[in-house]
Amino acid sequence: MTLKYYHAEPAANSLKSMIPLIEKGLPFQSVYVDLHKFEQHADWFVAINPEGQVPVLDHDGVIITHTTVINEYLEDVFPDIPLRPRDPVGAARMRYWNKFCDEQVMNYVSIHGWHRMVSIIARSIESDEFDRLMQHIPLPDQRKKWRAARSGFSEAELANATEKILFAVDKVEKQLAQTAWIAGDEYTLADINFYSYCGMSVERMFPELAIGKRCPRLIEWREKMTARPAVARALAGEDRTAPGLRTWTGEAR
């Protein structure tokens, strides 16, 4: 049995499927894909994933893409040390929260990430080179996001994204008043999902929102997450991000 995991820095999508691999104690080959060099759009990588997106799981030559799909695949193939409830009701609750994170959290956090971080990269590239790079991006939506990052997101788009993020953290805060973890009293993929996209860094991303005062249960939950050995190991993974882009402070520095 051979597992290869193609990924970027230990954050967001790449972190979301790396944590389950480690939680389950699965040996895997880590293959770093340098997004800053646009390796995800290089011929060798597009041959693996025609969408030009990380992460990718290669299980004995079978290619699995998209983090929620990868994580469910790991549960099906490697059920030991489960991260999905065994009972149908518990699994349904976990999937509800995963759907919420994928559709209502990730997209809006991503807008701020592209605005504050990717825009710096996009604007640093000469116009001719930028146009050449855009031609190598397989997905139209990704090309659109790169162009938006270069030209800048509108204040209305950013305000709407912030509003949706506030709704999400408030929703999780209310849930944590009822259960120990997001999908119930078990630690599940739903916790990993929200942590990877938002929970691990929402305070640093939006210091002006005073999340610590607004959502104390969320902060306690985040500390439980960060203290998990598998999470700590995943976060210690390779990070080639330029130092000036690593810290979310409400400003791009």
Language-model segments: which ranges?
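Positions that flank functional sites
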Residues: 35-36, 187, 240-241
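Long, positively charged, glycine-interspersed low-complexity recognition regions
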Residues: 212-253
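GST-like fold's C-terminal all-alpha helical module
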Residues: 103-223
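GST-like domain detector, emphasizing the conserved glutathione-binding G-site
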Residues: 1-138, 249-252
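The C-terminal cap of the DNA-recognition helix in HTH/winged-HTH DNA-binding domains
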Residues: 79, 177-178, 227
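Residue-level signal for nonpolar/aromatic packing positions in well-ordered secondary structure
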Residues: 57, 94, 172, 191, ...
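Short beta-strand segments
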Residues: 6-7, 193-196, 236
